[in-house]
Amino acid sequence: MNPRRPLTPETYYRLPWNLADNSITWLEPTTKCNLYCEGCYRENDPDGHRPLADVIRELETVRKLRRTDGISIAGGEPLIYPHIVELVRYVAAQGWKPIINSNGQALTPALVRDLTKAGLVGFTMHVDSHQKRPGWIGKTELELCELREKLANMIYEHSGGTVACAFNATIYRDTLDDIPMLTRWAQAHMDRVQTMVFILFRSVKAQAGFDCHAGGKPVDVGQLVYHLDHMETHKDILAQDVADKIREIDPDFEPCAFLNGTEDPRSMKWLLTLKVGDKDRTLGYLGPRFAELVQVFHHFFWGTYLAYTRPWLVRTAQALFPLALFSKSIRKVFLKWLKEPGKWTDCLHIQSIMIIQPCDVFEDGRQNMCDGCPDAILHKGRMVWSCRVDELVKYGTFITCTPRGGCCGTATQATPAESGANLPAEAAGTLPAAKPEAPLAVKPEASAPAVKQEVKAPAVKEEAPAAPIEMPAAAPQAPAPPAAKPKSAAKSKSGKPKASKAKGKK
């Protein structure tokens, strides 16, 4: 087996998204849903449909707070919202790209046609084996590919190929090994599936060794919708784990851009890869400079960072070949393409693979959220993480975490900065007593509790008191430093409440 090849965020393009200027903004016209998804972080409200006028007022406020390319219409299940076509039409009329995040259960050919006419730009379909979907309960990820193909074909055929199609899958420990198969499936349908998204499961853990508070008052995180008793021992999956799985079938797999965390600048919360090829072959991967060029170019000419594109733009990768003079990654693709003249007329596609790593809770209680998250939603006049709204609804503020027994008292693992787990190899090697490879359950971000910058003193290290040193009478003015007694650096162990980013849709 090939040794793990570490991801190198220092070589990737840091996506320029931020709170005020982003590619996407989240919108929930309803919190009513027609499915139960184990990874969902929104409570199903049978009376959750909002008046269209209220939703439009929310969008008017969003315009004042945030520049955005696309509006992700989610929920709940947006396809059962009675005004979904009118809402899509309104969003498109404002110059935004309407994108629907759906479980696909209510999708019909007629609805695809109506939404296409209203100006819909893209669908993101959430399908995975932990959903309680009638007729599909108990099916494996492989068996669910039949449903994925049915939805992709419906979107392609009834939109005339003008609406982009993406698929989300929440990844759990028991489905991690399905990633190579899902990656192959997505490539086999590059002509109809423009994006594949892997969302790494998170849930709040009530028994993770933390005391949780909201506004200074103790709270029971077991009351949150994203707490699942049977997931208390679930080990968090990291972006590196997903990359390792993809590299089992494609050793050349290499991301090009990422979004970091609020606490760990090297954590890869949104990790983007751009693959060039067709259903039978991969010609290569586009590099960081290309990702940067696309974002900067789009922002310069259209004033926003790029979200979704129309499918025809990613069906003609040959149009990029003139840039081979300036781009090493495009040059590699071009040279590989030249070696097969019999396929020069075949259509080349660009397919995005996005890995989303939700909230990481460190041993000192800090919560590592997405810095500049695209899925921010308006809540009571401010933009907040959509995956944490349940905390705001129940407690009026985000939850904060403190290790039981004092700082790091019951922690099981150190933060990446202390362990060297998320540092470049050369830097990690300089740290004392480095812990073995990247902690598997120590990072990730999802809708976990607290992310309010209530600076809980990051892992305060307890310093063993050192006996004062007697100084020579001749030099009273220059006290020597205390005897070099080693710090008893509180080694941490991890306990981490978390939540799921796995919205039953996106």
Where are these regions (language model features)?
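N-terminal [4Fe-4S]-dependent radical SAM core
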Residues: 1-26
